[in-house]
Amino acid sequence: MNEQDKLKKAVGEKAATMVKDGMKVGLGSGSTVYWMIRSLGERIQQDGLKIEGIPSSNQTATWAEEAGIPLTDFSNVKELDITIDGADEVDANNHLIKGGGAALFREKIIAQAAKEFVIIVDQSKVVETLGEFSLPVEVLPFSWQRTANEISKLGCVPTVRVHEEEPLVTDNGNYILDCPFKVIPHPDKLNKEIKSIVGVIETGLFIDMATTVIVGEKDNIYIK
């Protein structure tokens, strides 16, 4: 296991300790969340922890089932006690870019549904200003080229994310446009501008949503 994976494992295990008996838990996506799910599974097996989870992606659902975490959905749950997820960038104000794993729409739903939204990252994801990581935007496949052209007027050249030489299709049946803005000094303004474009489903900008950010750096875990 390399150093970055060790940090992901450490922050994932730390976040898992925040989950208490009886909680409804939003399960995010990505490699850091994998370790959190593993740790929750161990607590279920060893300590009899009783929780229910709502996954943000099909991959997360598979990991949760393998870990023995009972799953539910929003037909049975109105509110989540906690959602734990990773991020691609976290800025000085704890605004986020997410969506590198193409699950941003469902991730935002379970984040907004939770009383507490905990982000787990390694130090490499912490930045002063968002934008170095291309901003993912989920769009309808119908006329995605036109949607991309409208987004380009805001200051970037979007590209459709591909998988095996075809546009990647999200769990919701949509496409992802990766938008390299380079620097996003006013994420709230940009988020509103992009979401006003017809054809946009959701952006990977998570503004004022994270309640806690757990960061792993060499030999240390700190709360941001």
From Swiss-Prot:
**Which InterPro entries does the entry link to?**
NagB/RpiA_transferase-like (IPR037171), Ribose5P_isomerase_typA_subgr (IPR020672), Ribose5P_isomerase_type_A (IPR004788)
Q: Name one GO cellular component term.
A: cytosol
Q: Which Gene3D superfamilies match?
A: 3.30.70.260, 3.40.50.1360
Q: Which residues participate in substrate binding?
A: 29-32, 85-88, 98-101, 125
Which GO molecular-function terms appear in the entry? ribose-5-phosphate isomerase activity
Catalytic residues in the record: 107
List the catalysed reactions: aldehydo-D-ribose 5-phosphate = D-ribulose 5-phosphate
Which E.C. number(s) belong to this protein? Answer: 5.3.1.6
Q: What is this protein called?
A: Ribose-5-phosphate isomerase A 1
Q: How does it assemble?
A: Homodimer.
- Which purpose does this protein serve, as stated in its record? Catalyzes the reversible conversion of ribose-5-phosphate to ribulose 5-phosphate.
Q: Which family does the entry's similarity section mention?
A: Belongs to the ribose 5-phosphate isomerase family.
